[in-house]
Amino acid sequence: MTPQSSPSSSRDHVCLVCQDFASGYHYGVPSCVGCKTFFRRTIMKKQKYICQFEGNCPVDKTIRCACRYCRFEKCLSVGMDRNALQQNRDPIGYTKRTRRPKKELKTTSDCSSDEGASTPPSVSPLQLSPPPISPLLFQAAPLKPRRCILQTLAEREKCANDLRLSEYLPIRSLHEALCSKALLNDTAFLEKWGQPSERHQIFDLRFVNHDDYHYWHERDWFLLTEYAKTFDVFEALDYQDKAELVRHAAITVPVLVQVWNSPDYGPDTIVFPDGAYFDRTPEPTRPAGLNRKKYQMLDLVLKPFRDLQLDATEFAAFKAVTFLNPDADISLPARKLVNNERVRITKQLYGYMAMKDDVDTAIERFARLVLMGTSMSKMACESKEAVWIADFFENIGFSAFARQLFFGDTTSVVAHKL
């Protein structure tokens, strides 16, 4: 009995590996000719592949040739059975009757494997040429966890929000905040302080005042410093680079937190956890630049967030990418470290979105998210300029911590160096 089913049954299936049209049942599962051929060649030639990334590349009909390692892992995970191959009935390569002229081999690409062509082992940079491989390598096994980084970020975000809603808000300098232990990694601390305060519950809505802005910005800046310390790459930086990276994110990350955690009371309303809210209502007592920031939050962040309908995992990853910005005024070695971590998370985010939606939808949502980051960077530059102007004219009474965050803390830097 051959692995392939009758042609009539193939119309009812798609390929479980790449979601293309299945030509029938091959090696136990519905699959297309390309994935069937790829799986057979991998087993028969005892080929071994490696992934250039983290073993979580998307595999579908549009990019199934991108990573052979992840494609083969997908074949195994959906149930393709290597024992279904028959040595005498599954030859690899061309017979005398079907052998192609040599001149055509020159144009054979890696992706031609989907048409049943035999690709020379030396073509792919992902392919190794080791001694014969142990059969244990090909035993069916589940794929590596695809969301390990994103799951960590999502869990971290939940802890951060629990702390945001608690009573805990220490008074400390920026240097103390950045050099102390990471509270979000302290299980005992979170068990003690991770309960929501009665103050941070919505009983009724009231229009925001200056004290509300001050209170919630202080809380979100405190959370920003704690959030930063959860990244290993951040802890590897020297103090000056840490301070500059946090300073660069002092507008964008709190904006994301405030928008994401706001209950939906309409398209132009952001609500804090205690019921204070702001909308497009003019606030003549606030500096013009900060009023402009309010409108930008509604237009550039709130509306796109609601349109994209991000889930908690996507938000946590986007927040991390926003924070890990190599455009901050940090040293070159720090910039390389931060950028590498940012790229790593960005790849995971795209892979997650590609698994969640069809390819076209995933690409569109990912592109809109990236463009939103660009708009937020522009908003942050304008808002920081507004903060400097407000401080110059003494329109706002900044706390000592806020002044150190926005304008620098030379005393702490000197003390750190000593």
From Swiss-Prot:
Q: Residue limits of the NR LBD domain?
A: 170-409
- The record places the DNA-binding region at 12-87
Keyword DNA damage attached = no
Any Pfam family matching the protein: Hormone_recep
On whether Transcription regulation is a keyword of this UniProt record, the answer is: yes
One cellular-component annotation, GO: nucleus
User: Where is the major localization of this protein?
Assistant: nucleus
- According to the UniProt record, where is the region AF-2? 398-409
Which residue stretches belong to region Disordered? 89-130
The listed locations are: Nucleus
- Zinc finger extent (NR C4-type): 15-35, 51-70
| UniProt entry keywords in alphabetical sequence | DNA-binding, Metal-binding, Nucleus, Receptor, Transcription, Transcription regulation, Zinc, Zinc-finger
Null mutant: what phenotype?
Answer: No obvious somatic morphological defects in adults. However, shows diet-sensitive sterility arising from germ-cell proliferation defects. Dietary supplementation of L-tryptophan, but not the D isomer, to E.coli B strains suppresses sterility; this effect requires live bacteria. Sterility when fed E.coli B strain OP50 can be rescued by dietary supplementation of either vitamin B12, methionine or choline.
Its BP terms in the Gene Ontology are:
cell differentiation; regulation of gene expression; regulation of transcription by RNA polymerase II; S-adenosylmethionine cycle
InterPro entries registered for this protein in UniProt: HNF4-like_DBD, NHR-like_dom_sf, Nucl_hrmn_rcpt_lig-bd, Nuclear_hormone_rcpt_NR2, Nuclear_hrmn_rcpt, Znf_hrmn_rcpt, Znf_NHR/GATA
GO molecular function annotation = nuclear receptor activity; RNA polymerase II cis-regulatory region sequence-specific DNA binding; zinc ion binding
Expressing tissues: Expressed in germ and intestinal cells and at low levels in the hypodermis.
Please give the function described in this protein's UniProt entry: Probable transcription factor which may have a role in detoxifying dietary metabolites arising from bacterial tryptophan metabolism. Required for fertility and involved in proper postembryonic germline development, especially germline stem cell (GSC) proliferation. Required for activation of the methionine/S-adenosylmethionine (Met/SAM) cycle in response to low levels of SAM.
Q: Which family does it belong to?
A: Belongs to the nuclear hormone receptor family.
What name does UniProt use for this protein?
Answer: Nuclear hormone receptor 114
- From what organism does this protein derive? Caenorhabditis elegans
